[in-house]
Design a protein with these regions (language model features):
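Short catalytic/metal-binding and nucleic-acid-binding patches
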Residues: 1-149
Length: 149
């Protein structure tokens, strides 16, 4: 894969975060739309740029590029706003939504980007939700969630 010179000047992060609550919470249509709406709004406002994503029933994996905000500034706002919106979506009464188990890795070069993209796209395969990432609906290959890429 060839990348443009200085392609990694703006920090790129591979992050994963899990949400507690009901099973299959994030793959439900209304909840995918909540995530997509927030991520697309943050991109339109040039806060971050989503490069790749995979949504599992209780976890989201993202490769994001910092634009106007650092990960440390963007993440708490995203975390709190989406947890509140998921709770208020009315899908399941009495469920308290909280993001936890945040993992993050700074992608420093093309080799790391390729490795992280592979890991992100193969999450559904390793977790048993698909046999091939190309057949999994909720990722940046098929983009059923409608996240701007």
């Amino acid at each position: 894969m060839d990348f443009l010179p200085n392609a990694f000047d703006s920090p790129i992060w591979y992050i994963g975060m899990q949400i507690n609550g009901a099973s299959e919470l994030l793959t439900q249509k209304q909840n995918r739309e909540i995530l997509a709406k927030r991520l697309n709004r943050d991109q339109r406002n040039a806060l971050i740029k989503v490069e790749e994503y995979t949504i599992l029933p209780d976890t989201i994996h993202l490769i994001i590029r910092e634009v106007a905000l650092t990960l440390e500034m963007w993440w708490p706002v995203f975390r709190d706003a989406t947890a509140r919106e998921l709770e208020d979506s009315g899908g399941i009464d009495g469920v308290t939504c909280n993001w936890h188990n945040l993992t993050q890795e700074l992608i420093i070069d093309a080799v790391a980007f390729e490795r992280c993209a592979y890991d992100l796209l193969y999450q559904p395969v390793t977790k048993g939700y698909a046999t091939d990432p190309g057949f999994y609906e909720f990722n940046s290959i098929n983009n059923v969630a409608g996240i701007d890429l």
